[in-house]
Amino acid sequence: NEDAPCVMHLKERYYLQVPCYKRDLLADMEIRLAKEKSEQGIDNAMYLRQYGYKISYSKFCEQKFRPDYYFIYLNEKVKGFKNIYKLPEGEYLCFREKILEENWNPQRIINYFQGKEEPKLMLAMEYEDNLDNYAHANYEVQILLKKS
């Protein structure tokens, strides 16, 4: 099953992020990130085409999509710019989920972490082909299990 969770080793990655606020619509986050990209003055060739969200494990378990940050990946490390961050290299639990749908069920992930420490880093990545019908889109969720 291609939607079954699997553990993957992911290399260090860099990204530009902006905060998300409680009342934000998805469009508000996109506009804020586009403005930040413009203000940074980083060459557009430095950005990859994948966007994502930093989300909280507790909100995920409550079936609430309330991201803390919205981000875009960079293809390499850049120095001297604000709001550029690094995701650590390590082991990540990865799976696909339709986290914007009302009836999705986080139980398999809750079961996975039962009796374990609550994850500190959780990401939800957009797929490019989801840009038309985002309400029913699959997201790739990555949860840091262990840094390398």
Task: Give the location of each predicted region.
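A solvent-exposed interaction/effector surface
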Residues: 1-148
